[in-house]
Amino acid sequence: MNATEQAANGDRGTTRSAGGRLRYLLHAPGACQLMGVHDGLSARIAVAEGFEALWASGLCMSTARGVRDSDEASWTELLTLVGTMTDAVPGVPVLVDGDTGYGNFNTARRFAGRAERVGAAGVCFEDKVFPKMNSFFGDGHQLAPVAEFCGKIRACKDAQRDPDFVVVARTEALISKLPMEEALDRAAAYAEAGADALFIHSRMNTPQQIATFMERWEGSTPVLIAPTTYHTPSVDDFAALGIAGCIWANHSMRAAFAAMRDVCQRIRTDRGIYGIEDQVAPLKEIFGLFDYEGLEKDENCYTQAPDLAAVQG
């Protein structure tokens, strides 16, 4: 029984791979939640707080690398960060933001293959041309031809090793201010090309575009959203529309950004740290999250001096 069949039968049993677990969540009743992360620390925190799946955000990883979200970081740099996430939270599904696939079908399938090898559950590619710009900045978002993008999807599906590895197709038609019909047509074409899920993106300040899309969508392929700008509804509200998953794409990084800026300002202004200790995480919380006590126990176990008398008989 594959992960899709497990979800249909209400079976929450473990699956063979991270891809299988993500596939299960996308087909289970309701809308799953994927927390945006950018490194091993943010992944550990998200899982410790109960998230079952993660989104390796291109914006957040690029920002963590100190560059813009416009394909300035190489895909090998980003997948190195993804590896820190899968190492930090083994078995937890990580869906990787693969931007446009960094070129043609060949670079897209190479990206997907490398993501699979570092333990990711799946990849998401968007239908903009390379190089891209972040969807929330500016208006010059040119889309790739439908046939070209479908070729990327097919190439990735043909090359994957794990049958449960998830390939998500993201359309930027609404971001590019194209008609709803264009978004629906592209979604249908991408599903036909083999996409395991669709990501419908909007930057309106209400969910109306998403609601309209779901009312008119006749396919069975799961639909994901990232409600970054239309943030009033809850995950349950989106589930009622038929959404399969909500990606909280960049909130962890933005929270860290604000906290780091504020503490830097405070220390510089106060010329000391006497006023901030109650505003930062205690070191014991960090030691606890990373199981320092476990390492100490292992040291006692594995570095004890041998009993020479016993060894010599």
Swiss-Prot record:
Active site (UniProt): 69 (nucleophile)
The protein's annotated pathway: Secondary metabolite biosynthesis; bialaphos biosynthesis
Superkingdom of the organism of origin: Bacteria
Gene3D superfamilies: Phosphoenolpyruvate-binding domains
The family this protein is said to belong to: Belongs to the isocitrate lyase/PEP mutase superfamily. PEP mutase family.
UniProt-listed PANTHER family: PHOSPHOENOLPYRUVATE CARBOXYLASE, PHOSPHOENOLPYRUVATE PHOSPHOMUTASE
Catalytic activity reported: phosphoenolpyruvate + H(+) = 3-phosphonopyruvate
Gene name of the encoded protein: bcpB
SUPFAM superfamilies registered for this protein in UniProt: Phosphoenolpyruvate/pyruvate domain
EC number annotated for this UniProt entry: 5.4.2.9
Listed GO MF terms: phosphoenolpyruvate mutase activity
Protein name in UniProt: Phosphoenolpyruvate phosphomutase
Swiss-Prot/TrEMBL keywords: Antibiotic biosynthesis, Isomerase
InterPro entries noted in UniProt: ICL/PEPM, PEnolPyrv_PMutase_core, Pyrv/PenolPyrv_kinase-like_dom, Pyrv_kinase-like_dom_sf
Enzyme category, top tier: isomerase
A Pfam match: PEP_mutase
Protein task: Formation of a carbon-phosphorus bond by converting phosphoenolpyruvate (PEP) to phosphonopyruvate (P-Pyr).
Biological processes, Gene Ontology terms: antibiotic biosynthetic process
